[in-house]
Curated annotation (Swiss-Prot):
Pfam families: THAP, THAP9_C, TNP-like_GBD, TNP-like_RNaseH_C, TNP-like_RNaseH_N, Tnp_P_element. Its EC number is 2.7.7.-. The lineage of its organism: Eukaryota, Metazoa, Chordata, Craniata, Vertebrata. A zinc finger (THAP-type) spans 1-89. This is DNA transposase THAP9. It comes from Homo sapiens (Human).
Amino acid sequence: MTRSCSAVGCSTRDTVLSRERGLSFHQFPTDTIQRSKWIRAVNRVDPRSKKIWIPGPGAILCSKHFQESDFESYGIRRKLKKGAVPSVSLYKIPQGVHLKGKARQKILKQPLPDNSQEVATEDHNYSLKTPLTIGAEKLAEVQQMLQVSKKRLISVKNYRMIKKRKGLRLIDALVEEKLLSEETECLLRAQFSDFKWELYNWRETDEYSAEMKQFACTLYLCSSKVYDYVRKILKLPHSSILRTWLSKCQPSPGFNSNIFSFLQRRVENGDQLYQYCSLLIKSMPLKQQLQWDPSSHSLQGFMDFGLGKLDADETPLASETVLLMAVGIFGHWRTPLGYFFVNRASGYLQAQLLRLTIGKLSDIGITVLAVTSDATAHSVQMAKALGIHIDGDDMKCTFQHPSSSSQQIAYFFDSCHLLRLIRNAFQNFQSIQFINGIAHWQHLVELVALEEQELSNMERIPSTLANLKNHVLKVNSATQLFSESVASALEYLLSLDLPPFQNCIGTIHFLRLINNLFDIFNSRNCYGKGLKGPLLPETYSKINHVLIEAKTIFVTLSDTSNNQIIKGKQKLGFLGFLLNAESLKWLYQNYVFPKVMPFPYLLTYKFSHDHLELFLKMLRQVLVTSSSPTCMAFQKAYYNLETRYKFQDEVFLSKVSIFDISIARRKDLALWTVQRQYGVSVTKTVFHEEGICQDWSHCSLSEALLDLSDHRRNLICYAGYVANKLSALLTCEDCITALYASDLKASKIGSLLFVKKKNGLHFPSESLCRVINICERVVRTHSRMAIFELVSKQRELYLQQKILCELSGHINLFVDVNKHLFDGEVCAINHFVKLLKDIIICFLNIRAKNVAQNPLKHHSERTDMKTLSRKHWSSVQDYKCSSFANTSSKFRHLLSNDGYPFK
């Protein structure tokens, strides 16, 4: 039932039309003192008891009776301040008596006496004596009559439109007007062919049946233009009502009302970390299959927009799910908002879902600053449907807020996806011309071909590398193609005057530019340096210089035939970065630069898809399948994941590092992909019988008193195996570098590693050897304890904890990784801890399979190293890391890809 304002003389009703006009409605407070103040301000008496009027549970007051200073704003949403009391005169804004027909004419003809009492309506009781001017009441009546006449005129016009199509159903009428696409027409005819729309009362939304709600939401999501057309005929509800209908508490498609309720409580409690967010949207493929769900006693696999399955025989099955996630601009919160089962995640459908989501977040007081999507064909269609212009000549990076005409929202394409598009274009063109030179793909091929190149065989060796003749070049295959490391390596090879790299100046400049762009849109913490730091007024000029340079170069890019790339078929990667640059400038000018805004800085990774990819990665772990899941499997996995990681008064949290997700997403953009595509062979390490001499002065006295030739050699074998195995699995460039010897400053230039090699053995780093030595010492210490009577898994977890405890006292391990710790988010679980854990797990697995046959202990006979090597290598090939889930809370994190978080 529609409620009316309880103030005397006010006929404002709580309808969609009233809320569209900016009015809000407020219930009487529950606090006794505050409630009594409101009652006295209303100034009403009960007509029967002649006593003061007591409001019921449904009594409300409209915002007309409050001062503007009584409200406080949360984004677009307004809320009454605590202690606010209605003070605006009830008759300051004239309101007429709600009468019709002859009664209306009579009251206009008869003048009111000067001391008349107010006439009560059906919705109001008698009040205390209050003066009311005759002119004000007549004016209100005339205004109301004009509004009613205007509404009747529009209604008559709309119904005449239907009468012109006498004999046609609604869908036929829409087809005749050419408002429906073929896909939408087929969907509506299949699901609503027998829908008797003319028999329903469409004016009262409270009386809508489930089928009416489903029809309205389906029509809106398919086309807002069609919805607006039909709304004139059937009086369909405003989109704000649809947002409410699509909210669900149970684990089914639609918006998660529990999440929105939690966010609303945080906003209303004044938590500023929840006032601004970015919105991420992504589609995930599903397997088209119908399955019987015993729990719901229904078939699963149909399309579902949140109001029930579209289960007609001719309706296509769901093939994709669209997910939406909010990421806090401040703080470290991120939470999935809901999902929808669709047959095809078209750009227009995703645009409609975005509008509903933005409006729903606005209703609870959260302001959406930006939207991020993939750089796909459907995403481009979605951007255009929102009002984004991607063309270089007329670029528009913002679109209008669906609930506020005065607010704009920025649009971003995911930077990682843009890198992949640029990589494909670079490899396809082979050569890209621009004003600073020519970038050649062949230079990257020549770089990876230097793998295992001995420095002693090189014609020219710089004086700085004169003592590295027994070293070999090892290309760090985890290095990103577009990185400063590759650019520095090419720059160094250019200085050596090597023939394959004599014309690589243009390639170096191109790689550095793309790397700088990615760093700008991937700033992760406020302690970052250079372009990886936050967006501040102090750093804006430097960042803006790179953005201007990128625009200047991108508009001049051309292939070998002088065809402009930015106007060709493979332009989206370059145009996407230009659009992101405009969006970043707009955000800085509107939120960071103005002193009145609460934005001290801006971290651009808040607009990255890494957050959503993290959720999907964890979702796939719950699914335990590499193929596309069915609708029922996805729904159950989503519910299990949400239940596991969403605690009371907590937003969705994760123990997996976002930084690792970012590296994993760019795995196919590393140098190893070039090695694989062009057949560059990588020499495997072969161990021989000859002894390896290395300084082990840091060993314990008990070990020093022994003949350590075999012991030393075996430990180095283990360290070498661990280094080679992890270098093939890790995707972090800095962590791989830390595995190899780096006793000289010139041991690393960009992506090139100068690794000491003797008798086929790559020397591991000193820190790695120390870790392996500590691992062996701890295992020996506990080898005769009762712990070895435990099952294998429990024994491994026990040893892992003991080794980590022993390593915690060694602060000088892998010191070269210290700067690398600030590349990701500030957190306790960083790459240093993860690297230690990976080394420990790898060592224990190798040792567990070979200790019975080749124990690491001193004996008089020399071990057959070839046999040891062969057995160790076989065990490494079969090696899979175990879970580390039960480790102490300080080092516990979720592993993936056979136990390796960086894979």
